[in-house]
Amino acid sequence: IETLKPKACEIIWKPQIVKEFHTNGMMFQAFDKEENLLETWEVYSVGGGSIMEASESRIGRSEIYPLTKLEDIIKWCKDNCKELWEYVEEYEDKDIWAYLMKIWHSMEKTIDIGLSKTGVLPGTLKYPRKAQMFYKKARREGSRLKNTGLTFAYALAVSEENGGGGIVVTAPTCGACGVVPAVLRSIKEELSLDEEEILKGLAIGGLIGNLIKENASISGAEVGCQGEVGAACSMAAAIATYFYGGTLRQIEYAAEMALEHHLGMTCDPVGGYVQVPCIERNAVAAERALSAANYSLFTDGSHRVSFDEVVITMMETGKDLKCAYRETSEGGLAKNYKIRD
C-alpha cells in the first residue's frame, strides 16, 4: 500500500480459495478511475523466494541444467569423469563461484550474528535464543559432544536470526535456513576446509535442492515441512558426504536417505511464527544430515530406493496432507499447543 501511494489500493484476503497451481497465490488487478478492470496479473510464491506466473510450467524446466534427474546427472559425471560440482560448473555462468562465495560469506555472517545474541525473539511465543548457550557449552565438551553441540549451535544461530527478522540465505527456504550453514561450518572446522572446497560443496547442495524444487516442491504451504527441512537435510547430507570423500553413489544415497526419513513431516508453526517447532527442527536436521552421510559411507552406495523416486514420493505425500498440516497453523502443534504468558 505504501509503495503504491498516492494511488488507492485495497488488499482482499481469500484464504478459502486454494488454487491448483500453488497454495500461495496473489492476484493483482488494476482499475481506471471509473473502476473498469484494466489488467490482471496472477503470481505465486513457490518456495525459496521464487515467484512464478500461472502461465509458467512448474515441472521439467531446463533453463540452465539440461538434466532433471539425479540418476542422469550421475551417469553424465561417470561418462565424463567429473564430480557433481563440475556438472554445475559446466552449465552455470562463469560468475557462479563469485555468487557462491557471496552466499557462503552471508551464511557465516548470520551464524556469527546469531551466536552473539541473547534474549527472546519477537512475537507472543517469547521464544528464547539458545544458540549462544549451546555454543559455550559445546566448547567445554569433549570431542564427541563438542562437534554435535557446535552443529546444533550453528543451526540455532541461523534459524533464530530468521525467527527474529534477520538476514538469512534461503537454503532452500527461510524456514529451513539453518541446516546447510550449520553442516558447512561444522565440517569446515573439523576438516580445516578452504573456501574453494566449501564452494564446491555448496554447488552440490544447490544442485540437490534444485532437483527437489524442479521435480517436486520446497514449499511448506504445498507439501509440508518435508519439502523444507527435509530438502535442506538432503542438501546438507550430500554436501557432507562429498567432504568426507564419498563416491557419487554414496552422495546420492545420503541425499536420498535424508529426504526419505522426513517423508510426511508436517508444517504446523505455532502461532504462525517460524519458531516452534521450526528452530529446533533445523538443529536436529543438521545432525541427521551428518548421520545420513556417515551411514552412506559405511556402505558401497548401493541401495533400493533412488533419490529421484523419493522426490516424487515426497510430492505425492505432500499433496495428500490436509491443509491443516501445510503452513496454515490450523492443525498439529499449532492447534494443540497453548501459548503461555
What residue spans do the PLM features occupy?
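Gly/Ser-rich oxyanion-binding loop with an adjacent helix/lid
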Residues: 1-70, 158, 163-171, 176-208, ...
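C-terminal regulatory domains involved in ligand/effector binding and gene-expression control
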Residues: 2-141, 150
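Generic structural signal for well-ordered, non-membrane alpha-helical segments
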Residues: 21, 93-107, 144, 148-155, ...
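Short, charged low-complexity intrinsically disordered segments located at boundaries
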Residues: 22-24, 133-142, 186-188, 213-217, ...
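Short alpha-helical interface patches
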Residues: 55-61, 70-82, 89-92, 174, ...
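Generic secondary-structure transition motif, activating predominantly at the C-termini of alpha-helices
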Residues: 92, 108-115, 159, 163, ...
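Accessory "access/gating" subregions that flank catalytic or transport cores
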Residues: 98, 105-224, 332-341
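Functionally critical mobile loop/hinge segments
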Residues: 240-341
